[in-house]
């Protein structure tokens, strides 16, 4: 049971770090991205980084983080997660299995 919790926590943390890194990358490359609006929305999520790092002392997001998150279009977030979930197989890596 403890290993499952550690695995799930690690997987969630990995995804969170990946999404924050992706958001920063998208912000840097935003002008090159085809979906500029989505890229800009994701880029604003960098203010949420302190709350998604494993072992973070404060896991309660700031108002700034919540505002940035509320500014991300539902389809933008879902499409980003879908594309991100396909990256491991595109790199010939095992698919992520994060559990619940």
UniProtKB/Swiss-Prot annotation:
Disulfide-bond pairs as recorded: 38-76, 48-65, 66-91, 78-98
Signal sequence extent: 1-33
Entry similarity comment: Belongs to the A9/FIL1 family.
GO cellular component, one term: extracellular region
Name the record gives this protein: Protein MEN-8
Entry keyword set: Disulfide bond, Secreted, Signal
Organism this protein belongs to: Silene latifolia (White campion)
Localization per Swiss-Prot or TrEMBL: Secreted
